[in-house]
Amino acid sequence: FISKTALSVLVVEAKEDVAEGSTKANSAIVHAGYDAKPGTLKAKYNVEGNLMYPALAKQLGFPFLNNGSLILCFDEKDRPDLEALYQRGIQNGVKGLEILERDQVLAMEPHINPQVVAALHAPTGGITCPYEACIALSESAAQNGVKFMFESPVTAIEKMENGFRVTAGNQTIETRTIVNAAGLYADEIAKMAGGIERTIRPRKGEYMLFDKAAGTLATKTLFQLPTKMGKGILVTPTVDGNLLMGPTAEDIEDKADTATTQEGLDDVLSAAALTMPDIPRRQLITQFSGLRAHDLAGDFFVGEDPEVKGLYHALGIESPGLTGAPAIGKELAERIQKDLGAPDKVDWIAERKPIARFAHMTDEQRAKAAAENPAYGKIICRCETVTQAEVEQAIDRTLGRVTIDGVKRRTRCGMGRCQGGFCMMRVAEIIHKKTGMPMESITKKGAGSALCVEEDTLCR
């Protein structure tokens, strides 16, 4: 949204690519908005962001599915909580909410626990792919003149008369305005700039991802009644056809601790079994965890710092942050444009064209694609039917450092049953040929994850 203005914009990123951190590891849910406390910023941006997703996904070419959600009640004594959730959703302005009885729920989702007594149906709920959405937004910004600086963690911010001096990586940047959207580290950036004091506690959520063979066991996103720690363990299809279960909710201290644990995964299976008793454990293909930026104040902080002019925050953006992100970005961009008196960009490009997916093509489209570009005729990832042409395009379009996981997030190469066992080194070879990077410099996910070492190193 800020790229719609004539402002000069630089995105400073600590990691080697976009869509790192919490963006790549969350539930991928576009929430309807029934859960957030009425009157909070979480409630406001949830409902506003939800309404923006269909058009934004179409405009920028990332996946979105309006599959709806069910909040399940398994005990009659909990029915008042379900009805309270319905009333909260009405207060928040959520459309189409209805309470369904047992037979209606089971007709809609036959694989869930038959002990269900009722459910809140939220038809405006949806699912997306968070990293593809972020990549699409970043590419759109780049094609409209926004610059990116990677592997540049911010280490110092100095307030000057007409703005700020920011030290990031090995560079110094002078700017009139800062937007603090640093996720787990937003409290540290705020403190560095002399702004508001907030405390962000990482809240770990562990997930289990199942093969596409299990993807049809649920069509809607299935929640249990929420608790003070969050929306609980969900069972949901993904936009790519898998089945996802999780997350746990554990407050931790280490902002870099994304390790999965046996206890966490046991908790996911145990809790998810209440929703879906016959969990297809043989179809489990991977586990992962993500960290939510939980602000101890309990709500988002969006807007200009009350003490430091020119410092804007998107702080404490935990769930429903993915849903609210478009609305938050739009509002901040409009505020900054107004405050700086910047005109609109006259040649703004509205649409972004995604990589054409071979797996989604008809036979006729595949034949045409291969005739125009023979690389579309060579399969690199058998599990997800990803071609060499798609891998090459992903490499060309990467804004930061090219990595195996960066290609994976742009193409799904390595996201199937074998989790890259067949295609990982083939992707590395294509990166080597396309970029000239030595094989020992190519990493899976940045520093510390090299795939190859020099031969003489092995002999030491």
Regions found by a protein language model. Give the residues of each.
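Dinucleotide-binding Rossmann-like beta1-alpha1 core, especially the glycine-rich loop
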Residues: 28-108, 117, 232-233
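Helical element adjacent to the flavin cofactor pocket in flavoenzyme catalytic cores
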Residues: 120-177, 185
